[in-house]
Each structure stands twice: as C-alpha cells, then as structure tokens.
Amino acid sequence: AGASVKIIAPISGQINSAKGDAIKIDHSFPTVSSVMFDSVYIPGGTDSIKVLSTNSFAILFINETYKHGKPIAASDEGLLLLAKAARAGGAINDTYSEIGVAIAENNEVNDDFAQDFIDLIGMHRFNERPDLDAIAA
C-alpha cells in the first residue's frame, strides 16, 4: 500500500511558494473532481488560503469530499478554508462533523497529526456523518 500526493490549485502549470520555490500543479480545481481522490489535506499559508477562500471550485471540491464521506485534514490557515467551505455548503451549525476530519491541534503538524490522518485514510469512508444530507455539493 502507498499514497500518491497531488497538488491542486486554481490554475494549471505551476505556482510559487512563499519562499519563491516553483511548485508543479498536478490538477486545477476547474478541471478536476473530488471523486478522483480518496482524501484531502488543506495546509496553511495565508496568501494561498486567501486565494482559495474566494474560489468557488475549491469550496465545491472540499464540500464534495466531505459529502462523499472521505477523510479531510486541515492545519494552520487551512482551518479557515475548511470552516468557509462548511458554511458555504450549509453544514449544520456552519461547521462539519468531526467524524473523519483531522485537525492539527494548536496548529501543530506533527507525527500524531499525520498518523491520525493516515488512520482516517485507512478507514476510507465516513458515511455516518450526521450532516451529509445538509451539505450542498
């Protein structure tokens, strides 16, 4: 068993990191569907989250991932995007259920957080989320 990591962004081609490093984009949100993936991790980054928070394709991607019961992990400013997607999707109390969602406590992306996400991926789906019918996706 193994995992394959893909970078998805609002545009195709490449983007630059905060340090100026080029990052190859594997897919763009307008041309890819969440059904192609088993899980999603939303990392932080103030500038990237500002851009993604105003991108309807990114919001839809997260909501579809959640609605399909797939694992989601978020850290740092990625928590803001996760919350915005939940509100936009019509989640109960404007927040997703914690079932199948890994959150980096105190923004600590450490081995425990990584293992929690790996364990969630191993469980595959979380169809027992109480709010799946409420999510617009």
State where each predicted segment sits:
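Active-site-adjacent pocket-lining segments in enzyme domains
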Residues: A1-A137
